Amino acid sequence: MNELCMIIKEMTKPNFLNIRTSIQTYDRDAQCCGAPCWRWAYHALHSADKWFINPFLYEEPAFHEDGMDDPEKPCEVILSDEELLEYLKYIEQKTYDYLDSLTDDMLYEKPEECRYTRMELVLRQFRH
């Protein structure tokens, strides 16, 4: 049975839509807490990519630079809004495929090498 997983999937869709809408409408270079807004968008995307499934068995995207997910740290890489939207598209598909692969019982289990249950990981991303 995967009724809870399907509910999670449906509740995840507006989160991704909100991120997409933000990237399509924000002033990417406006400063927010000392960093350009695009860095905060990347921070949210990277967190969803890394923490929704298993942060302890995760491979950084090819374009990622160490510390790039922390908007308060300087980085050389500058991602365009198109690149951010492509990354979002990748994360959405990865997340939906993952949720489709789960059963409700699996939400109470900890993924390999992870100290959190799958449900904890999901809930952490909803609050993020």
Label every PLM stretch briefly.
Residues 5, 9-13, 17-20, 25-70, ...:
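Short, contiguous alpha-helical
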Residues 27, 100-103:
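Helix-capping and short linker residues that terminate individual alpha-solenoid repeat units
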Residues 1-7, 47-98, 105-110:
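Short, helix-capping/interhelical loops that line the mouth of catalytic, cofactor-
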